[in-house]
Amino acid sequence: MIHRNTFINAPLHLDDTLRLRRRPDLRLAGQITGVEGYVESAATGLIAARCLVAEEVGGVAFPPPPETALGGLVRHLTSSSSDTFQPSNITWGLMAPLPATASFRGRRERRQRHAELAVELARRWGETLPGHWV
């Protein structure tokens, strides 16, 4: 059996709410967007659905902050070079770095601080939709 990973060139075709640029009435999620992994595929579904709900209730659709795992994944899908785009799962490298003013000792402390910031930013992102639907 041969495994074939089929995906679109997401930076070329998707906006940051996972809509097709040429068909904004359609959103994509899952492996076809260029994510790898079950969690990542489900996460893109959550993001696409949340953005759709935000628009339907009269709000503004926007992706999670790039300092979060979900936001970093969206940023990878929509801001990578379309010439070299390849699927990815969530890694620390996808997330926007901590502010330059942040001080910490070592990788463990840096990741702990990043995780704390990401949780807070994700909470705030979730609260931007009426009913706090995350």
Show where each model-derived region lies.
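A glycine-rich dinucleotide-binding beta-alpha-beta segment and adjacent secondary-structure elements
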Residues: M1-V35, A42-A43, F62-S79, F85-T91, ...
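Non-catalytic terminal regions with compositionally biased, polar/charged low complexity
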Residues: V60-E67, G126-G131
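Predominant activation on well-ordered alpha-helical scaffold segments within soluble catalytic domains
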Residues: A43-R50, V74, V119-R123
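C-terminal auxiliary extensions adjacent to catalytic cores
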Residues: S88-V134
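Generic hydrophobic secondary-structure packing signal
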Residues: G37, S41-T44, H114, A118
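Internal hydrophobic alpha-helix adjacent to the cofactor/substrate pocket in enzyme cavities
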Residues: S41-P64
